[in-house]
Regions:
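Solvent-exposed interaction patches of small proteins and small membrane subunits
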Residues: 1-134
Length: 134
């Protein structure tokens, strides 16, 4: 697995955590909140593609036999790349799907509540992938 460069994903995780820290200091700042939600969106997307790429590299999947997202998460969890399994990641996925509705205050709050746990998962995933590529 040594040929995959995961550093852009690590930068995305760092930026997400930076946004969370700013929001923690000013929890009513909607600009920070919206920025954290946007950083969550792109970090979530990068984590998903990173997992797929990693697993395809480790055990090539035929293009016509692409893993479903739940199977991808379960496999990555079984391999120790994730702290949590599908039950937790399903919640992250639901939050990601809600991000198109963040103009609704209650939905924005629901999404933001899940982001700190996601950031920890993303950081763990990045660290595990860095270990495997070393």
């Amino acid at each position: 697995m040594g040929t995959i460069d995961y550093s852009p994903r690590g930068k995305a995780v760092a930026r997400l955590k930076e946004g969370l820290e700013a929001l923690r200091r000013e929890p009513e700042n909607t600009l920070y909140r919206d920025g954290v939600i946007q950083r969550f969106e792109f970090t979530y997307g990068l984590c998903s593609s990173m997992l797929e790429r990693c697993l395809m590299h480790a055990a090539p999947i035929q293009p016509d036999r692409k893993m479903t997202f739940p199977a991808l998460i379960r496999t990555a969890s079984d391999l120790g790349l994730l702290h949590s399994g599908w039950d937790v990641w399903h919640g992250f996925r639901e939050a990601r799907n809600l991000t198109s509705h963040v103009y609704k205050e209650e939905i924005a709050r629901q999404v933001v509540e899940k982001i700190p746990a996601f950031a920890e998962e993303a950081e763990f995933l990045y660290a595990e992938l860095e270990k495997t590529s070393a």
